[in-house]
Amino acid sequence: VAALACALTGLTIRVSAHAVPPVAGKDFTKPAIVILGYGLKPDGSMRAILYHRTLTGLAIAQAFPQAPVIVTGGNPRNGQTEAAQMRNLLVMLGLPPSRIIVEDRANSTVQNAQFSVPLAKKAGATGIIVVTSSTHQGRADQNFADAGGNVLATVSFPDGNPSVNIAQFVRDVLSPLTPIG
């Protein structure tokens, strides 16, 4: 399904050279696949980075059919959250809704981790496979480790725009100080 979606849209899914390969001693029997959100357009539609992350997550979900898929991201625009848009795309591309766990309160990478780690544990996951963008990978890995997550691997695609990280970094530094409503 992901290959068909890519063929129809002209997009390709690439796994970053920095993706962590399976390591002896890590338990991949039931990982939770956590797809990190990215800000929506003002009209509530997905930006290309979020679309790529979601397709990458779908490819990983197909490789691990026993794994729950956690889509995480709030930041509503025009009545839609990042998580809701990812869920809609995954279902449209054939992922069973029963595999998807929606986390739609997070407004930063720190909160993605804080809210997703307990959901993964509740789902009985043996660890987490984080799906994000290459310029976001290091920070995401650290945030999930800080939140007590057992990060088995991180899968990312090259997004090639480190300047985007400045605003994200500032938001992530401030997010633990921001009340969640």
Model regions: which residues?
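Glycine-rich flexible loop motifs, especially short His-Gly-Gly/GGXG/HXGH segments used as catalytic or interaction
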Residues: 169-181
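Secretory targeting and sorting signals
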Residues: 1-14
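A structural signal for short, hydrophobic/glycine-enriched beta-strand patches
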Residues: 13-171
